[in-house]
Amino acid sequence: LHKAYTMDQLEEAVKEADVLVLALPFTKETEGLISRHILSLMKEDSLLVDVARAQLIDREALLDKVKNNPRFHVAMDVWWEENEAYPKDGDLLLAYPNVIGSAHNAEMSSTAHREALMNALHNIRAFMDGKPVKGKVNREEYRR
């Protein structure tokens, strides 16, 4: 990592990035963030990794990028529809050799589960004691 970018600098960041990792929440502001325009700015031989939500990416634009740019690579653990993780007839991403995916299970580890449990227990205790909880979600930011 040579430089950190803000969201306002997304275009500049993707032009320079060899790897773009999406680890953002799916909100009204992030839906479709990786648009056809943003994909067009990415290096032809770059890698896009999505471990957040598929809805952050314009699906049709990504499919076009993958089809037309064999040096562009994608790694995904999230899908617009869960059954899309398994290729069938048609233009599914996993049908292309420059795409690798897993079935929405990359976070499945004993460490991740233990950490989630410990965080939940901490927050329950804090809530019961009238203290602030960590990671409180603003429901207005998220789709319902």
Where are the regions that the model predicts?
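Structural alpha-helical scaffold elements that stabilize or flank donor/cofactor-binding regions
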Residues: 12-16, 38, 92-93
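Rossmann-like dinucleotide-binding domain for NAD(H)/NADP(H)
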Residues: 45-47, 51-144
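Adenosine-nucleotide cofactor-binding segment
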Residues: 1-33
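Conserved beta-strand positions that form and line the central face of beta-propeller blades
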Residues: 3, 41, 136
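Solvent-exposed, non-membrane alpha-helical residues enriched in polar/charged side chains
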Residues: 11, 39-40, 63, 125
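Rossmann-fold NAD(P) dinucleotide-binding segment
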Residues: 29-48
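Structural motif corresponding to alpha-helix initiation and N-cap regions
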Residues: 4-10, 36, 59, 86-87
